[in-house]
Amino acid sequence: MSSVFHEHTQFVNVTEIDDLIQDILNTPIHYNVLSLFSGAGGMDYGFKGGFQLFNQEYSQNPINLRYANDIFLQATQIYKDNFDIDHDVDTTNINEIDLEEIDQKYGFIPNTRNENQNNPNGIDIILGGFPCQTFSIAGKRAGLNDERGQLYLQMSRFIQHYQPKVFVAENVDGIRNTRNNNLENVNATALEIIMNHFNEIGYNVQYNVLDAADYGVPQSRRRVIIVGVRSDLGRNIDISYPSPTHATTPRTAFDGLEDIWNLFNTNQIPNHNWNN
C-alpha cells in the first residue's frame, strides 16, 4: 500500500460526510466525483475508501471518480497508479479549462440543481486542495494578493457550473491568519473572504482544523478542511469530526517507512535538510 503515499496525501475519515451525503441524496447510488488540484489523489483516496490503515478498516464508499485535474505531470502519473480509472488525468492549466468542452468530452450534465432525481451524468461532489504556497508560513504569505492565492475562484467556477450537492476543500492553517487588506479593500483573513464567497454562491459552509499527525501520519500537517452543502437542500452542516488516534503517541518517519525500509540500501539514501 506504500505506493499510495505522497506528500499531499490526506487521510480523511468521511463517515459523517458520507452519512450526510447519503441522507441528502436519499438513494443508494454512486456519487459522481470531480477532483481539482488532485495531486497524487490523497483526498480522493480518503473518499474512495476500501483500505486498511493502522489496523482500522475503511469501507469502500460508493463513488465514481469521473474527472481529475492537476498541472503537475508527475503527480498525475502517481494518481493513475493509485486509482483504477479508464481516463487520463487532465493536465490542462485550470485557468484555461473550457467547461463546455469538458462536458462534451466526459458527458457531464451541468447544473442539475432543479432535477427531481439524481442525474447519472451530474456531478454530486467536488473535491479540491487549491494551492497553498501563498498562505504557508514557509512562503512570503502574499495570500489572495498573489495570483496563486486566487485559484479558489477556479474551484468556484467549477462549483457554480456543476452545482454539486457537496464540496470539500482543504488548505494550510495559515489561511486563517493571512490578511488581505489590499484585496477589494476588505480587512479580513483569506479564510473569511473565501468562506463568504462560497456562501454567496449558494452553499452553507463550515471549516475545521485537523492535524494529520493526530491521525497517524508521521508528519505534522495542520490543514483547514472546508465543507460546503448546497443551501437549497435545506441542511445545516453538523459534522462530528473523528477523534485523534495518535495525539499523544505520534508516529515517526521510521514508523511510516518500516514496511519498505528493508527494500533499500540505506547507505545510498542521502540525508535531506530543509531550508527556508
Where are these regions (language model features)?
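N-terminal Rossmann-like NAD(P) cofactor-binding module of classical short-chain dehydrogenase/reductase
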Residues: 124-127, 168
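Conserved short alpha-helix immediately C-terminal to the canonical SAM/SAH-binding motif I
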Residues: 74-78, 151
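S-adenosyl-L-methionine-dependent DNA methyltransferase catalytic core
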Residues: 1-65, 197-200, 223-276
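Conserved acidic E/D residue at the C-terminus of a beta-strand in Rossmann-like folds
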Residues: 67-73, 170-174
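Conserved acidic residues
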Residues: 72, 90-98, 209-213
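S-adenosyl-L-methionine
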Residues: 77-114
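Class I S-adenosyl-L-methionine
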Residues: 105-120, 132-276
